[in-house]
């Protein structure tokens, strides 16, 4: 079960539905695809989608971290020593979380294939399936409502709405959306760090009035002090995203009084399944719910996140829609989307079907 070859390439993915969030617009993305082959013929897959605005990792830095010459230490290593390999990934690539994540998930894929089981079973399944949200970017009211109707028609019952920080615009969109949905879907909101303290208090009043599920990352990432100054009831409705990169952040956020009630884990922020599961353990111990999110990603890494999410008892929310709007992808399988719910396949490993 020794590693015989590692190949990395860049794939360009146009989006079928470009969108805007508080700090940028997104029309296309690049992912790095990782293939790790063992001497006995197994193929493990990983994908990296670095997000410079969140982690500081550029596509160029990610590519450099995955340069073939820098991965020589993995050649000949036994995949069954997975915990040690993941530990070494963190030591060798500390500033490249997306690169680490791609290698980490490919190694997990291989180990689960070696054992002949879906990865979620190796990790310890806690859920069979969960509903995922789909994201509506920042756009005019009528376009927001039209997109919401499209998602409802496709069976989705959880919508995440991006906010811009302009209260008049944000509140009008949310009120009109509430009227249009008429109880047919749950709404959660994501200001992407665009609110200040007074604005958040006004937003929270609207959240309670409209029955909105929670608020994701209202404040700038460094303002944990603003979060802790909020009443406990409001903090419980806050999900930390940009404030939560790795396990150290999770530990700090969970320290009493907990700064939030929900952790949004993303493999591209934390560096893969191994650190994600450490974050999950901290959350479960502290009584914090888990949300599993993503960047715009190939279904390879979405599948990896889903396997991890379904193996954590504290998982309450999924926001794993990152591959839905790709105009094309490099793999199939990995998960099944049905009536807005995600479940993994019964194939071993990540369950992906890949043209070899």
From Swiss-Prot:
It comes from the Bacteria. Binds 1 Mg(2+) ion per subunit. Mg(2+) binds at residues 190, 216, 241. GO terms for molecular function: magnesium ion binding; racemase and epimerase activity; racemase and epimerase activity, acting on amino acids and derivatives. Its cofactor is Mg(2+). InterPro entries: Dipeptide_epimerase (IPR034603), Enolase-like_C_sf (IPR036849), Enolase-like_N (IPR029017), Enolase_C-like (IPR029065), Mandel_Rmase/mucon_lact_enz_CS (IPR018110), Mandelate_racemase_C (IPR013342), Mandelate_racemase_N_dom (IPR013341). The keyword Protease does not apply. Its EC number is 5.1.1.-. Keywords: Isomerase, Magnesium, Metal-binding. Pfam families: MR_MLE_C, MR_MLE_N. The keyword Zinc-finger does not apply. It is an enzyme of class 5 (isomerase). Substrate binds at residues 135, 160-162, 266, 296, 319-321. GO terms for biological process: amino acid catabolic process; peptide metabolic process. Disulfide bonds: none annotated. Belongs to the mandelate racemase/muconate lactonizing enzyme family. Part of a large, functionally divergent protein family. Was initially predicted to have chloromuconate cycloisomerase activity, based on sequence similarity. Protein modeling and substrate docking was used to predict the substrate specificity, prior to biochemical analysis. Catalyzes the epimerization of L-Lys-L-Arg to L-Lys-D-Arg. Can also catalyze the epimerization of other cationic dipeptides, such as L-Arg-L-Arg, L-Lys-L-Lys and L-Lys-L-His, but with lower efficiency (in vitro). This is L-Lys-D/L-Arg epimerase. It comes from Methylococcus capsulatus (strain ATCC 33009 / NCIMB 11132 / Bath).
